[in-house]
Amino acid sequence: MLVEEKIINQTIQLFQAKGLKFTLDELASELRISKKTIYQYFPSKEAILNEVVEYGFRRIQAKKTAILTSELTTIEKLKRVLIAIPNQYEQIDFSSLKGLEKIYPQVAKNLQAHFESDWEPIFALVEQGIDEEVFRPVNLVVLKMTLTAAFNYFLSTNDLESSGLTYREALQELVEVVMHGLVINE
């Protein structure tokens, strides 16, 4: 495994344990390397976090591609694409991202940009479902706005934690709510 990849993976683990409060000293200690070595790959903690976001969305994209090219039904594909998150991100308490925009504004912008992009495969699935008469016609812009707002809300409040839900459980519940508004017959 490359040093850069080890830094990313350890950052994910530290974030899982401490949220945004982990330090580069802790990261270096966990990796058994010097901070200077980390700085050879990343100029700052914010740069590392940006790469963690990029890495996560690359993994999400790979999962989505596998789902979209599978033999699943259109309904099942849409359900799975909407909740696609990398395995190593499943245990993360995403409420730890609350306040991200104040501390690491560039990372927050990057995360938001990813939430707002690459909706074409989802739109195509919904349109396919409409053509197959398993989904009722819906305004795709409103669907995107609803889902994006929910994703952002999940990440920006402590409501999931206080209700005992993980991010993945909340996504699954959101998908159930959305799908029962779309599905004609299952």
Predicted regions and their residues:
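Hydrophobic alpha-helical connector segments
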Residues: 51, 65-91, 144-147
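All-alpha amphipathic helical-bundle segments outside canonical DNA-binding/catalytic cores
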Residues: 75-76, 113-116, 130-148, 165-169, ...
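Short secondary-structure transition hinges
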Residues: 86-124, 131-134
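Phosphate/oxyanion-binding loops and surfaces in catalytic or ligand/nucleic-acid-binding neighborhoods
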Residues: 84-88, 92, 132, 150-157, ...
